[in-house]
Amino acid sequence: MADLKQFAEQLVNLTVKEVNDLATILKDEYGIEPAAAAVVMQAGGGEAAEEAQTEFTVVLKEAGASKLAVVKAVKELTGLGLKEAKDLVDAAPSNVKEGVSKDEAEGLKKSLEEAGAVVELK
């Protein structure tokens, strides 16, 4: 049993190149197709099979020195009214937008940072 645990640890810690080499060996010497090896690798090491994040949340961490500029930027970017935008900025850290694409999230972050805000993408 200890040998299996040691083998599993070695398998999980393989680099991408080593996994490719292993897939080639399994295919050439044992007739196991790479798709089957990938299924085995996913079962053994879940971290390696993690999906890329597709939806992001834009989080306003703090307004910074130019709070008025940040309120204006939040108002323009979200379509909120002036009071709602001010309340969102005052409540920092707060979510400006949730479930947006990477491109949209990066655009929002850039605009808010240009206004002086500290922004994080989650």
Swiss-Prot record:
<comment type="similarity">
    <text>Belongs to the bacterial ribosomal protein bL12 family.</text>
</comment>
<dbReference type="Pfam" id="PF16320">
    <property type="entry name" value="Ribosomal_L12_N"/>
</dbReference>
<dbReference type="InterPro" id="IPR013823">
    <property type="entry name" value="Ribosomal_bL12_C"/>
</dbReference>
<dbReference type="InterPro" id="IPR014719">
    <property type="entry name" value="Ribosomal_bL12_C/ClpS-like"/>
</dbReference>
<keyword id="KW-0687">Ribonucleoprotein</keyword>
<keyword id="KW-0689">Ribosomal protein</keyword>
<dbReference type="GO" id="GO:0022625">
    <property type="term" value="C:cytosolic large ribosomal subunit"/>
</dbReference>
<dbReference type="GO" id="GO:0003729">
    <property type="term" value="F:mRNA binding"/>
</dbReference>
<dbReference type="Pfam" id="PF00542">
    <property type="entry name" value="Ribosomal_L12"/>
</dbReference>
<dbReference type="GO" id="GO:0006412">
    <property type="term" value="P:translation"/>
</dbReference>
<protein>
    <recommendedName>
        <fullName>Large ribosomal subunit protein bL12</fullName>
    </recommendedName>
</protein>
<comment type="subunit">
    <text>Homodimer. Part of the ribosomal stalk of the 50S ribosomal subunit. Forms a multimeric L10(L12)X complex, where L10 forms an elongated spine to which 2 to 4 L12 dimers bind in a sequential fashion. Binds GTP-bound translation factors.</text>
</comment>
<comment type="function">
    <text>Forms part of the ribosomal stalk which helps the ribosome interact with GTP-bound translation factors. Is thus essential for accurate translation.</text>
</comment>
<dbReference type="GO" id="GO:0003735">
    <property type="term" value="F:structural constituent of ribosome"/>
</dbReference>
<dbReference type="InterPro" id="IPR000206">
    <property type="entry name" value="Ribosomal_bL12"/>
</dbReference>
<dbReference type="InterPro" id="IPR008932">
    <property type="entry name" value="Ribosomal_bL12_oligo"/>
</dbReference>
<dbReference type="InterPro" id="IPR036235">
    <property type="entry name" value="Ribosomal_bL12_oligo_N_sf"/>
</dbReference>
